[in-house]
Amino acid sequence: MAYTQTATSSALLETVRGNNTLVNDLAKRRLYDTAVDEFNARDRRPKVNFSKVVSEEQTLIATKAYPEFQITFYNTQNAVHSLAGGLRSLELEYLMMQIPYGSLTYDIGGNFASHLFKGRAYVHCCMPNLDVRDIMRHEGQKDSIELYLSRLERGNKHVPNFQKEAFDRYAEMPNEVVCHDTFQTCRHSQECYTGRVYAIALHSIYDIPADEFGAALLRKNVHVCYAAFHFSENLLLEDSHVNLDEINACFQRDGDRLTFSFASESTLNYSHSYSNILKYVCKTYFPASNREVYMKEFLVTRVNTWFCKFSRIDTFLLYKGVAHKGVDNEQFYKAMEDAWHYKKTLAMCNSERILLEDSSSVNYWFPKMRDMVIVPLFDISLETSKRTRKEVLVSKDFVYTVLNHIRTYQAKALTYSNVLSFVESIRSRVIINGVTARSEWDVDKSLLQSLSMTFFLHTKLAVLKDDLLISKFALGPKTVSQHVWDEISLAFGNAFPSIKERLINRKLIKITENALEIRVPDLYVTFHDRLVSEYKMSVDMPVLDIRKKMEETEEMYNALSELSVLKTSDKFDVDVFSQMCQSLEVDPMTAAKVIVAVMSNESGLTLTFEQPTEANVALALQDSEKASDGALVVTSRDVEEPSIRGSMARGELQLAGLSGDVPESSYTRSEEIESLEQFHMATASSLIHKQMCSIVYTGPLKVQQMKNFIDSLVASLSAAVSNLVKILKDTAAIDLETRQKFGVLDVASKRWLVKPSAKNHAWGVVETHARKYHVALLEHDEFGIITCDNWRRVAVSSESVVYSDMAKLRTLRRLLKDGEPHVSSAKVVLVDGVPGCGKTKEILSRVNFEEDLILVPGRQAAEMIRRRANASGIIVATKDNVRTVDSFLMNYGKGARCQFKRLFIDEGLMLHTGCVNFLVEMSLCDIAYVYGDTQQIPYINRVTGFPYPAHFAKLEVDEVETRRTTLRCPADVTHFLNQRYEGHVMCTSSEKKSVSQEMVSGAASINPVSKPLKGKILTFTQSDKEALLSRGYADVHTVHEVQGETYADVSLVRLTPTPVSIIARDSPHVLVSLSRHTKSLKYYTVVMDPLVSIIRDLERVSSYLLDMYKVDAGTQXQLQVDSVFKNFNLFVAAPKTGDISDMQFYYDKCLPGNSTLLNNYDAVTMKLTDISLNVKDCILDMSKSVAAPKDVKPTLIPMVRTAAEMPRQTGLLENLVAMIKRNFNSPELSGVVDIENTASLVVDKFFDSYLLKEKRKPNKNFSLFSRESLNRWIAKQEQVTIGQLADFDFVDLPAVDQYRHMIKAQPKQKLDLSIQTEYPALQTIVYHSKKINAIFGPLFSELTRQLLDSIDSSRFLFFTRKTPAQIEDFFGDLDSHVPMDVLELDVSKYDKSQNEFHCAVEYEIWRRLGLEDFLAEVWKQGHRKTTLKDYTAGIKTCLWYQRKSGDVTTFIGNTVIIASCLASMLPMEKLIKGAFCGDDSLLYFPKGCEYPDIQQAANLMWNFEAKLFKKQYGYFCGRYVIHHDRGCIVYYDPLKLISKLGAKHIKDWDHLEEFRRSLCDVAESLNNCAYYTQLDDAVGEVHKTAPPGSFVYKSLVKYLSDKVLFRSLFLDGSSC
């Protein structure tokens, strides 16, 4: 028993603690089911398309306001008041949702076109023409219907079934759909309708008198009327102007005239009666007769629109107990007027009635007054002495936040300007992670000054009251009034000497509490309404059984849930689907599952129409028209004549797909090859198919693709024949472009009416004298075309597509059995190669011409392959084994061989996928290799209206091979290819920069005389090609025509100024155009387009990056011996010349635009404007968001204008922005890294690369802890630091994971243009307490010293405590005659990118140098999970790892990390010289070394966003390292020096002198002008716009060397 209780208790405790896995699994399952149910419920909502262009905020407004709908925002239609206009359709659908489907409905003033488009045949619209605007609106609705019908007619479509009833009703009985009478006088009849009648009024009840509304509803026997109208509660407060902010509209009232208009746009206004609208708002009962009344009830308010319903009430159904005998006062007074004495008795009888009484009241809530207070504002005119006083509503939280804060100001700080500054700052928003962290107060900026004055006076009065209270009302000789004015005078000083007199005389301020009283307004106003009706009889309520309707609704709900999985389910017409299920007596769930399977391509059936609607399904499955109507007929008859001629005779050309309800069975196998003569004199109508968009394909995907290919041939044949028939019918209307492609021969005169560009046409269309049209296979003699006597005209085309399509149809017809193609079992391999990868070369190396077959799309490609294969003189490639695709299809069976072992298809992805499947089947091969490029131009369906579904375009293959090395493309094009292809694309070309572009002034400027074009000429469009040919250019082709070809030089031309869809960054046509050349490509264009942008980007790619794409063979090196020399710099004293303007000019040339920035008030702007920040988990003390006001001392003003910022003041926002920039949002780029093992390998490489061999093992006899090491550390500390250690007993360690956070007051200047678009964040300092530094400072100081002693100082420089002279000595033995690669590794976000792996590397280095295990573990834990506290700004957060900027190992730790990173990626054994300092590095390698992919390695292993730059001169720690033939000189960056001369933080002249001396120390080398030319080259390498700068270098020397002259660079700010 005890065991059972113990087990029960234990299980219960585990359940409570969350340790019970069964309970946890059940809870998770329950949570999952709940989420699934919720999402299913959301997907079942009605779908509404919102086509108006709206902003993201307005999108959120509409979505939140109408959760009943699933709204899709297309943003495809610009319109006035787009939000309100779009919401109108949502409001209409919401009102119609309230009405039972199919019930007779009156739409008062509605849009009858909207109901027709929705297929609502049960709605009657009353649309009276009350003014001219109504007539215009009604005509617009008619136009929309005509536009819709014309669009259907143009596409040969019919009105969908779900709209047919409504449109038929409108066509036959338009008065049943819409009338132009007012609703009160509408004559619409309800004879055939017996159900309940409903009405809706969408923004139309304004114009119906409220007293007539109930009677009008009763006259139409309306059961319930739903209405929507715009209104605002503030109109009940008798405001003359009210804004509706959400829809950007407003009401203006002038007497009884209420005007509604939209703001910020020019549109018509709407005027209504204010008193009439007020009745609709405030009344509850709308009498209809002496018995019935319509009672109003508000439903909801959405986006400034009020919804309500008017329900028909029979007052005789009221409980009889409410009846009583009372006095009808009106009847009594009326009778008394007739006679007082003689008819008194009669008057009392008439007034005594049986009455029913009821009453109701409505509370109107004023949301804008919630949490608001009424604040008085004061003003006075100094000219007229007229006083004004007004009251405004202001946020209560805002008012008391200001009052409470400024109440803490000291007497001197309590000034009007400080109050105004604080009010401005707290009005701005602070958003943290999308959530408002500081209260958002939307206070009108125009009121801030007046509000600040009120707050100031209110606080002054409060201070005085406190003083009086403290002194127990001992006021002394001064009165209360005098005290108040003393305080005000003290605040204003002598600025307004008569202000007290004016204020008192005008009685603007009363010295009472009421004068500055802040009141709370009422939130509610109640309106009452009373109903009085006579009682006569009782009526029983009817009973309605709704169970059946509920069951049907549940079935439909489940079916729609099934349909909701479709991507386009929002466009599925639910009403038509319901009607279809009812009319066909089909279970909705079964129908839904069939539709989902078909649309998801899971049923073996493909529907080629665009939208999955019931109307399109019906159109696809309906019977086609007969041949007599000129359309193709798909027949299901038995095949009596298995020939194309038989089909022609019957007027039928069969399709491989289904366009009826019976599968095609006319295509059967025929053993003998039929002749093309069967097409001769076939009627043109038998070949023309008017509509090809309703074809249904069945079977596996390959079968469907093959059927679609056959149908594409039929469609192409149909289109070509139809065009020639059109030309014959209207020869005179042929345009110029058509004349170049077609010809028309008049048979009687033997004259060409339209002369064709080619001759000897194989086919044409003949017009007989009987005006009949036939397709004819033409024959020629020496006089031309041989004609017949009954021919009138002959139309020919230069395109051979019809002739080839006829032949292909003849061939493919033989391969069908019972209308179904056979699919080959051969293995299909897709060889996906980049442009120029040698696909043709590979085919020739793999093919065996005795047993294999090569197929290519074009004749030129086939001839080229035969020529290359037979180049040795032995004929191996013939027309039997190297053929074009068209030749193989047209002449199938005529050759000696019909079966091949392997099939090679070049550029196979340019073919129709069904064509590829046919080729594999027809070759009878075992394996087929399809060579293509997935990113180049695919198969293009050029028959408009013919369906080619997207999933048909994907070729089904068994295996994919990739080729990613291009033998053709130069390096810059290879760089572009890497952006388009998966995997690394490499090249073998020696060309680096090959692309360029030129903007031409116009198309007319391109001609062979003034603009000869180099190499092959290409265009994007046929029209540009024809234009160039007409101007005299030769050998012009389109990009599509030369896919697969190679040219040395290419000139790409665009003459079309209008947008061309195929010219886009991700377009395959652009890819093909850029990859045809081997040496150069120049793009001539008349407009800016994406290709220009691509070429400009490629022109800016660094040559070093392009070297990374090159694939080279290894090179042999020969040892060379050169002389040994010692560094000695030539010294030439720099002349002291120049002026301030020289420095300003140089700065503006290097950094254009930076000096024009007015950034003195950037920090103030950030405080006063809205700001949105995204941060990680942290704690913010918002009470410190606004710092207490401080006196700002004037600083010296620089004469040199730079982008230097003013010193910043510490505060929550400033510190938080700095923390986000420096510590938050750290990159996460690294892959999976075995931290311990990888760190050990990296450290091994570090020691092997940098340390001397004899010092790679730690000195065990060396002690890290000694008095000498502590004394050395203490000697470097300030006295304040030593004082902090006075009470530290060193017994225990403080919290080593606790850090403090602060910011530097001066932002760091960047030598780029980012200051023009970014707010520079301050640098942060994250530091330990001095107690921790006292322990670990001496420790790591000794470890650093031991490390630096072990470094191979002849090759490596760890820049710690080194002078510029020592840097010159280190690089002094560089030989400028030896070719070198100067490499710089630029790492972004260096400190915060360091993670656990970096810490592991650093700890391993310290451990090997001798760090004790216990202290190493303590130090490790102190850098793992750390807490940052900023007491000044009120911020507390937690960080994992990262480099702390104020740590004792910050500098040396960063240095060893960058050195370790480079040692792990680069061949350090080949390094000549290397220098490391923090995150800076400079490396000198021999020319031609191979380097790995630095960016990838830095990302995956080191989590660094790194770029490796190859330069001519080094840049290290703000200094240029100039190596020359005599050694090396280090110049301080002159641009950085000029930037510092624009400093705005210099306090006084003494501070300026200290500043000058520090600059002199760092810029000492500028005194030597011997190497200014090399310095110019080095600066120009970094700043492309920098001019030669010797003049500015001399100017810097001049001013820095003269103390008095240097003072002229600044002005005294206190005197300005």
From Swiss-Prot:
GO terms for biological process: DNA-templated transcription; mRNA modification; RNA processing; symbiont-mediated suppression of host innate immune response; viral RNA genome replication. It catalyses: RNA(n) + a ribonucleoside 5'-triphosphate = RNA(n+1) + diphosphate; ATP + H2O = ADP + phosphate + H(+). InterPro entries: (+)RNA_virus_helicase_core_dom, Alphavirus-like_MT_dom, DNA/RNA_pol_sf, P-loop_NTPase, RNA-dep_RNA_pol_alsuvir, RNA-dir_pol_PSvirus, Virgaviridae_RdRp. The lineage of its organism: Viruses, Riboviria, Orthornavirae, Kitrinoviricota, Alsuviricetes. Residues 801-963 form the (+)RNA virus helicase ATP-binding domain. It comes from the Viruses. It comes from Tomato mosaic virus (strain Kazakh K1). Residues 830-1085 are annotated as: Helicase. The keyword Transferase applies. Heterodimer of a large and a small subunit. Belongs to the ssRNA positive-strand viruses RNA-directed RNA polymerase family. It holds the Pfam family Vmethyltransf. ATP binds at residues 833-840. This is Replicase large subunit. SUPFAM superfamilies: DNA/RNA polymerases, P-loop containing nucleoside triphosphate hydrolases. Residues 964-1116 form the (+)RNA virus helicase C-terminal domain. This protein is translated as a fusion protein by episodic readthrough of a termination codon. When readthrough of the terminator codon TGA occurs between the codons for Gln-1116 and Gln-1118, this results in the addition of the RdRp region to the replicase. Its EC number is 2.1.1.-, 2.7.7.-, 2.7.7.48, 3.6.4.13. The keyword ATP-binding applies. Residues 50-458 are annotated as: Methyltransferase. Residues 1380-1493 form the RdRp catalytic domain. GO terms for molecular function: ATP binding; ATP hydrolysis activity; mRNA methyltransferase activity; RNA binding; RNA helicase activity; RNA-directed RNA polymerase activity. Keywords: ATP-binding, Helicase, Host-virus interaction, Hydrolase, Inhibition of host innate immune response by virus, Nucleotide-binding, Nucleotidyltransferase, RNA suppression of termination, RNA-directed RNA polymerase, Suppressor of RNA silencing, Transferase, Viral immunoevasion, Viral RNA replication. Residues 72-281 form the Alphavirus-like MT domain.
